[in-house]
Regions:
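Active-site-adjacent beta-strand/loop module that shapes the phosphate/pyrophosphate-binding cleft
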Residues: 93-130, 142, 164, 171
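Generic C-terminal helix-cap and adjacent flexible tail
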Residues: 14-17, 166-172
Length: 172
């Protein structure tokens, strides 16, 4: 049985002049106005990386737990604030190169937290030093245009953006 993870991908539509909440019928074909909320992974491995070092807020869950409940829990743990109340659309399941299966839920929301305060994880660093340090799972999170997010997200999550673009284009 593969390791399972669930996450939330928030998105918003921004008009070319930067005004949020533009109508889909005024969106350009390229979806330049589509922005997504993604998070930079924490810890020393990711500290100086930017390209393909960002992720959809997500986390593992166990058999018997509902994926949306897990996604909401993980979002709150990683952002330090609950996910916004919304009608979350199941965007799909996406197999990662590691074999992990991620279930992603999407919602159109303008999420603007005052701060990001992630939970932490212990790690011996430097390796072999015997020193256990605690690092945030997430050290930054923000909105990116969909085209820029493609350069930031870990490569295994790029199909999630493809699914979101298909959804936004199809949604009346």
């Amino acid at each position: 049985m593969p390791v399972r993870s669930a996450g939330i991908l928030l998105y918003r539509l921004v008009a070319p002049n930067g005004v949020e909440g533009t109508s889909r019928d005024r969106m350009p074909e390229s979806l330049d106005g589509l922005q997504v909320w993604i998070a930079h992974m924490g810890g020393p491995f990711w500290a100086r990386k930017d390209a393909h070092a960002w992720s959809i807020p997500k986390g593992e869950y166990t058999e018997g737990e509902h994926p949306l409940a897990a996604a909401l829990r993980e979002f709150a743990e990683e952002m330090g604030t609950p996910a916004p109340a919304a009608d979350y659309l199941p965007l799909g399941e996406f197999r990662q190169p590691s074999g992990k299966l991620i279930t992603v839920f999407a919602a159109e929301q303008d999420f603007q937290p005052e701060t990001i305060s992630s939970n932490t994880f212990p790690l011996e660093w430097p390796r072999g030093s015997g020193q256990i340090r605690h690092y945030p799972e997430i050290d930054d999170a923000r909105w990116f245009p969909e085209s820029e997010a493609r350069l930031k997200l870990v490569k295994g999550q790029l199909p999630v953006l493809d699914a979101l673009v298909r959804h936004v284009r199809a949604d009346p």
